[in-house]
Amino acid sequence: MEPRISLVTLGVTDVARAKAFYEQLGWRGQEVEQTVFLQAGGMALVLWGRDKLAVDLGLEHGSPPGFTGVALAHNVRSQPEVDEIIAAAQGAGATITRSPSTTFYGGYAGVFVDLDSHAWEIAHNPGFPLAEDGSLTIPDFGSVQTAKRTP
C-alpha cells in the first residue's frame, strides 16, 4: 500500500446543506448523484449522505455521535489566517469548540465542528511549514528535538 490518502469522505445528514456550508468557506466542488467532490490539493474531500456511507462501508447507521475519534486539520501560514477561517466557519453556522489560542507545540490553533459534527482544527504550526502549493512534509523530529536542546 502506498502511503497516501486519496479521499476523505464525510458522512453528512443533508448533502445540499453541507455543500453550502463548505462553499461559504471558499471550497468549490462538483455534485454527482447526491455526492459532492471538493478538490483539496492533491486529494479530495467528499460529502455523502451519512446513511449511504454507512451502507457502503457495511456499517450500522445510527445517530451522529458527539465525538467520532477523528479530527481533520487545515494548516495555514499565519496566525491571522487561523482567526479569519474560524470566524468564517462560525459565520457559516459552525460551532467553535476551541477558540484560537497558543498551542503546546508553539503554534496557534482553533477548532470548529461543522454542521454534521465533524471536527476541524485550523492551525498555524511553525514546525510544519507549508510549501508554496500548500503541501505539508512531516519534519525530521529527531533534528527538531536536537535543535531545541542546543543553546
Walk through the language-model features, giving the residues of each.
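N-terminal beta-strand motif that seeds the catalytic metal site of vicinal oxygen chelate
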Residues: 1-17, 69-74, 126-151
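Core segments of cupin and vicinal oxygen chelate
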Residues: 2, 9-54
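Vicinal oxygen chelate
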Residues: 4-13, 36, 59-151
